[in-house]
């Protein structure tokens, strides 16, 4: 099923009503002064529903509670109905900028303390902004709920006076770094921005990017930001959603205590949906630092939850949703294009129907040729019509996506919050399923004729620099010059915080209650006679089954000169079998709502299987067919190989890829470990179909395989379903590989050139420890935690929060059974490359010489040992836990052993590990950026600078 089905579940896109599928209790179940009961929905008489209770505070704050006692954790989401679409002309990027500022402290929460307190509590947190909303969310152990509510309330009601010019300037630089990393320094990064400028009329809320224009942010001042907060961040424009192991009465009392005194903000209406049309195709183009050209066609359609959204989604699936789609058949399978797809993303005010394709250089087809194939495919669709299987696949995907979306508390809370924000009805999930199930063939043809056939689009060509002649057609449209709007200055005396007195001391951090015990998943063991070891766990929260089959046949089993063989085999196993074509296999899986993905890691060929349990046996038959009966079709191999080569060439345009590639090569030198599992242009060119068949026959055998299962079925029923694998026999060749220490020169900078790069990619590190679960590797990872392993680590706080050089910086130990490494990394502003290296080196040296502080040790212990509540919640999390046990031959007791290590490790032990493993003179540095600018700066630091080519 195409990704949009998961997206619509994640954002709870819904329309037609089906009130028979819910039970609404009209009476108040809890009475607390200042809180008004709205409704309660239970899970009776409905196939898919998220039970909840809904309330409203006197100040307008909407509160939604969802109880789920299966794990001792809570997820808290506060969504403000403001995104970039609420911004004024000339003040783009404010919503996203403000998201950053909301982590900079408030009256009673010090700068950077929000991250510290949540991390210390064993939780995770983040925020996000899109065109229509901004949300902040935390998942924490259940005993930490009050602390999170205190934190969120403090930045809602007590933020303004804590904002300083210094914080403002640092976060402005951080946003610029984020734009550099995600937009300006990324291939095709400006595509969506340019298309939106051409598609929407000037002043339309979607005509500017969410991240904003830098000149708008440069013009902004502190008062502008404060005014934005006062306009949009009132409780009456917010939804607070809390889910997990909660007591509703106690939770509501806490909500009233912390949020009740906050004054309502200005009234907020639902945004208008401005209508617009384009009266002719608009051709636009740009040159970019890319290898492959790209064509992108965007048609305006409807808006979120419009009655035609669902049939348009079905249409997008038919035209470009995977191997059964028309674009795949006409462009990808024919090797005219490396990639081609269709999507129909929807937002609150508008949706777009988008086609894109990247021509394959070997086809010698122009973007104009590709555009014609797309238009011919539309004609083919009109002649073909809508088939019954098209609707069956969509409905199966909706059902499975909905059920899989209920596996985590965070997923359920996110759906409730989004549904409330955009429809004033948290219970939209059932209605969403209903409207997709109601789509008919006639609906799909109707929306095709209304929104696509003979309609006009923005047609964007992105071509490599110097190849402007390759665009699909000459530009015939120029967006109007951007207006800065009235840009009226906001007077400082026009902004005043409205603070009401509390009957408690808000400055005191709430203390946590007793940490609830976390049960390690109970598990069962088994094996098949063919040598596959099985480890399973029963999870009855959803009627689903997830499996991971690991066969010792990964990247390290390939020869160095043919690196990429294992990954190409994995791709071939996802193609045709002797019984079905690739399209028929994809069709069969989509009709079941199941997925089978195969990929090669370093040590294992991994087969991931997800299915509704009712379809498990049918899904396993297809998985078995993929593994045992690959067709190895020559044309499919050539297509996959050629596409992989083009991908390897295109990757060289990405600074992060170049840095990681150079770093890997330097740490491993003449060894298969020095080459990515996907191979490179040279090694991929060496691989033949015969090599793939040979690798398959020598290595893809069941002996020593590992199968991990998480299902609502018990051991007996699961074992019965797995019985078909008994007929698979054989032993693969043993891995014979060592990864010796390289003789790479250390203490120097290896410089990889990327002309005119807006950012530089930095990697600093060395070969280090092999992975172990409770030994020195684990203890070294603990040692690194306060240095570079958390958001509020020394490295990130320095380079991001204090200096504004980067969007994020980190350090970590990584390893497997053969080798390991220590790495510090970041993408930084090009003009701060040398200064960033100075700060990296200073932080690493200082930590190695002076060690950890008492406060950092306390933080480490609390953060690591309270994470257990979050470790085993979802089937995916359980799969990872069981896979770790099976691969390393552990018992569940290793969890307690790790906890004991965290609780008892001393400062002296940590400091000794830092001294041993963080000697900066034993490390090498890789810098990717504009060499002509960077070389003199780096040499001025006193390092030898060595040019390095990839």
What are these regions (language model features)?
Residues 2-9:
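Sec-dependent signal peptide recognition
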Residues 12-15:
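C-terminal motif of bacterial Sec signal peptides marking the signal peptidase cleavage site
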Residues 17-63, 247-287, 329, 430-550, ...:
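Proteolytic maturation boundary segments
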Residues 66, 71-87, 93-97, 112-158, ...:
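M16 family metallopeptidases and their MPP-like homologs
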Residues 175-182, 274-288, 394-405, 611-612, ...:
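Short, conserved secondary-structure transition motifs
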């Amino acid at each position: 099923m195409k990704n949009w089905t998961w997206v619509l579940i994640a954002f709870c896109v819904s329309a037609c009503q089906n009130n028979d599928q819910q039970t609404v209790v009209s009476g108040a179940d809890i009475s607390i002064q200042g809180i008004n009961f709205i409704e309660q929905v239970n899970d009776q008489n409905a196939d898919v529903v998220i039970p909840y209770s809904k309330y409203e505070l006197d100040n307008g704050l909407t509160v939604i509670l969802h109880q789920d006692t299966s794990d001792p954790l809570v997820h808290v989401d506060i969504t403000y109905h403001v995104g970039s679409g609420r911004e004024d002309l000339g003040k783009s990027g404010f919503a996203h900028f403000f998201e950053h500022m909301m982590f900079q402290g408030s009256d009673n929460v010090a700068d950077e303390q929000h991250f510290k307190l949540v991390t210390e509590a064993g939780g995770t947190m983040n925020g996000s902004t899109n065109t229509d909303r901004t949300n902040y969310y935390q998942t924490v152990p259940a005993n930490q709920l009050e602390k999170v509510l205190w934190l969120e309330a403090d930045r809602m009601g007590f933020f303004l006076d804590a904002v300083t010019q210094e914080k403002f300037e640092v976060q402005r630089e951080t946003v610029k770094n984020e734009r550099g990393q995600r937009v300006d320094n990324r291939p095709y990064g400006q595509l969506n921005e340019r298309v939106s400028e051409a598609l929407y009329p000037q002043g339309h809320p979607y005509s500017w990017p969410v991240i904003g224009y830098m000149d708008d942010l440069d013009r902004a001042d502190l008062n502008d930001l404060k005014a934005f907060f006062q306009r949009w961040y009132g409780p009456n424009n917010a939804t607070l959603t809390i889910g997990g192991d909660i007591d509703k009465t106690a939770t509501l009392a806490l909500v009233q205590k912390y949020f009740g005194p906050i004054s309502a903000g200005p009234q907020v209406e639902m945004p208008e949906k401005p209508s617009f049309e384009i009266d002719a195709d608009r051709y636009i183009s740009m040159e970019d630092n890319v290898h492959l050209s790209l064509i992108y066609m965007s048609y305006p359609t409807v808006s979120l939850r419009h009655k035609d959204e669902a049939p348009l989604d079905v249409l997008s699936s038919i035209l470009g949703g995977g191997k059964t789609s028309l674009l795949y058949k006409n462009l990808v399978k024919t090797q005219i294009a490396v990639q081609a797809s269709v999507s129909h993303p929807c937002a609150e005010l508008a949706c777009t129907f988008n086609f894109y394709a990247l021509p394959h250089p070997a086809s010698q087809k122009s973007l104009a040729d590709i555009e014609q194939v797309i238009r011919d495919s539309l004609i083919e669709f009109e002649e073909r019509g809508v088939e019954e299987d098209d609707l069956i696949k969509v409905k199966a995907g909706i059902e499975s996506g909905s059920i899989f979306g209920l596996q985590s508390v965070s997923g359920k809370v996110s759906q409730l919050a989004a549904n409330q924000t955009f429809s004033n009805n948290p219970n939209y999930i059932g209605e969403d399923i209903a409207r997709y199930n109601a789509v008919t063939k006639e609906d799909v043809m109707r929306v095709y004729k209304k929104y696509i056939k003979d309609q006009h689009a923005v047609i964007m060509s992105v071509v490599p620099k110097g190849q402007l002649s390759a665009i699909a057609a000459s530009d015939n449209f120029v967006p109007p010059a951007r207006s800065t709007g009235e840009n009226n200055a906001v007077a400082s005396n026009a902004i005043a915080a409205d603070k009401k007195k509390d009957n408690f001391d808000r400055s005191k951090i709430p203390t946590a209650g007793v940490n609830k015990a976390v049960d390690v998943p109970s598990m069962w063991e088994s094996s098949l006679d063919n040598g596959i070891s099985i480890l399973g766990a029963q999870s009855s929260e959803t009627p689903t089954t997830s499996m991971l089959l690991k066969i010792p046949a990964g990247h390290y089993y390939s020869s160095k000169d043919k690196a990429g063989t294992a990954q190409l085999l994995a791709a071939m196993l996802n193609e045709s079998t002797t019984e079905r074509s690739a399209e028929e296999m994809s069709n069969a899986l989509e009709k079941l709502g199941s997925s089978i993905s195969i990929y090669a890691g370093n040590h294992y060929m991994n087969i991931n299987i997800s299915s509704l349990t009712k379809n498990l046996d049918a899904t396993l038959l297809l998985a078995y067919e993929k593994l045992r009966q690959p067709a190895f079709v020559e044309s499919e191999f050539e297509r996959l190989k050629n596409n992989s080569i083009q991908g390897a060439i295109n990757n060289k345009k990405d600074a992060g890829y170049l840095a990681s590639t150079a770093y890997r090569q330097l740490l491993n030198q003449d060894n298969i470990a020095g080459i990515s599992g996907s191979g490179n242009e040279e090694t991929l060119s060496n691989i033949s179909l015969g090599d793939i068949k040979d690798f398959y026959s020598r290595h893809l055998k069941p002996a020593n395989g590992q199968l991990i299962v998480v299902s609502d079925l018990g051991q007996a029923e699961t074992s019965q379903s797995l019985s078909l694998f008994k007929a698979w026999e054989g032993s693969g060749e043993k891995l014979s590989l060592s990864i010796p220490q390289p003789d790479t020169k250390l203490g120097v900078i290896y410089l990889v050139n990327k002309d005119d790069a807006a950012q530089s990619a930095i990697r600093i590190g060395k070969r280090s420890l092999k992975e172990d679960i409770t030994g020195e590797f684990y203890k070294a990872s603990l040692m690194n935690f306060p240095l570079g392993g958390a958001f509020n680590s020394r490295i990130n706080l320095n380079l991001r929060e204090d200096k504004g050089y980067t969007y994020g910086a980190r350090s970590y130990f990584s390893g497997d059974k053969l080798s390991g490494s220590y790495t510090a990394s970041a993408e930084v502003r090009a003009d701060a490359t040398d200064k960033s290296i100075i700060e990296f080196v200073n932080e690493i040296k200082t930590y190695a010489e002076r060690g950890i502080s008492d406060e950092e040790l306390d933080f480490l212990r609390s953060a690591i040992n309270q994470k257990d509540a979050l470790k085993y919640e979802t089937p995916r999390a359980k799969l990872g836990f069981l896979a770790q046990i099976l691969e390393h031959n552990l018992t569940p007791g290793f969890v307690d052993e790790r906890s004991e290590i965290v609780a008892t490790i001393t400062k002296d032990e940590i400091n000794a590990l830092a001294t041993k493993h963080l000697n900066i003179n034993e490390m090498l540095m890789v810098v990717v950026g504009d060499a002509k600018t960077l070389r003199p700066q780096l040499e001025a630091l006193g390092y030898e600078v060595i040019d390095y080519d990839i």
